Amino acid sequence: MSTDKITFLTNWHATPYHAPLYLAQSKGYFKEEGLKVALLEPNDPSDVTEIIGSGKVDMGFKAMIHTLAAKARNFPVTSIGSLLDEPFTGVVYLKDSGITEDFRSLKGKKIGYVGEFGKIQIDELTKYYGMTADDYTAVRCGMNVTKAIIRGDIDAGIGLENVQMVELAEWLASQNRPRDDVQIVRIDQLAELGCCCFCSILYIANDAFLAANPEKVQKFMRAVKRATDYVLAEPAAAFEEYVDMKPIMGTPVNRKIFERSFAYFSRDLKNVSRDWAKVTNYGKRLGILDADFQPNYTNQYLSWTLDADSTDPLGDQKRMAELQKEVACEGGFKRLQVASSA
């Protein structure tokens, strides 16, 4: 880039779980590191890795599966840290849609997806349930999955437990319908992945930018780590400050999305090697990665002591599901206590 600013492109329009990034800006953490950072939002989330890979933007957010696929397509990007760890992702639907927890109930339905990999995932699942990709209608919705379900344009859509499910639950409440009429069939469970890490949201960067600016990148990550520490220590105050910077965040729905995202924030921002191995294998299974593909991540720009990995990741997933149910019912800020290796 010709500017001395770091340019950073988010994976979505400004969203409650982007709080650490925006707070690093508003609280002056970037400035204290001697950095100027321009925060940008995409028109189409599917363009993010291409824009960063082409060098038009330096850094950004993207999910793990998309980051791997970007390298496979020769877009030179690398993950340098994690924002959200393993947010539950799946087919989100309303109870009156005729869809159930049985994947085969998608037959004959219109299923919305954000970008092409959502369709690839559903297509791949059909073969395990005696179906083909022709047994359902795929509808590309971009950032409008929730609206498409509400309008009846689709019967279900791929979404996040902490975003689209919250939006739909609040819409249901506005219609005097039970909030739990929104349901999710998790893709990780359907695909027997053993983790929901394919949709972990990552900090990614252009490889040439990384090579030329290692100290800048380390400073950037130190600033967002400081902001993450603040979010985890003072979530209510942090959200109010986020609303001050981004008034569009100041709605009851966004507050609930923030509460539901709180448990997913990565405390130490590290890339989890075990998760990368699982998702790389999943990408090979989906046919989007070659057999000899090597994952594109590093923790070398994280200058603090990293937490040990969990000793019970599958158990953590079950406990996280229960914890998120509690937050959905009661609100507030809760996080999982994770057992880790010494």
UniProtKB/Swiss-Prot annotation:
Tell me the Gene Ontology biological-process terms attached to this UniProt entry: thiamine biosynthetic process; thiamine diphosphate biosynthetic process
Cystine pairs: none
What this protein catalyses is: N(6)-(pyridoxal phosphate)-L-lysyl-[4-amino-5-hydroxymethyl-2-methylpyrimidine phosphate synthase] + L-histidyl-[4-amino-5-hydroxymethyl-2-methylpyrimidine phosphate synthase] + 2 Fe(3+) + 4 H2O = L-lysyl-[4-amino-5-hydroxymethyl-2-methylpyrimidine phosphate synthase] + (2S)-2-amino-5-hydroxy-4-oxopentanoyl-[4-amino-5-hydroxymethyl-2-methylpyrimidine phosphate synthase] + 4-amino-2-methyl-5-(phosphooxymethyl)pyrimidine + 3-oxopropanoate + 2 Fe(2+) + 2 H(+)
Identify the catalytic residues: H66
Q: What induces it?
A: Repressed by thiamine.
Which EC main class describes this enzyme?
transferase
A Pfam family (short name) is: NMT1
Q: What cofactor does this one take?
A: Fe cation
Alphabetic keyword roster? Iron, Metal-binding, Pyridoxal phosphate, Thiamine biosynthesis, Transferase
Oligomer and partners: Homodimer.
Protein name stated in the entry? 4-amino-5-hydroxymethyl-2-methylpyrimidine phosphate synthase
Species this protein is from = Aspergillus parasiticus
Q: What is the lineage of its organism?
A: Eukaryota, Fungi, Dikarya, Ascomycota, Pezizomycotina
List the gene name: nmt1
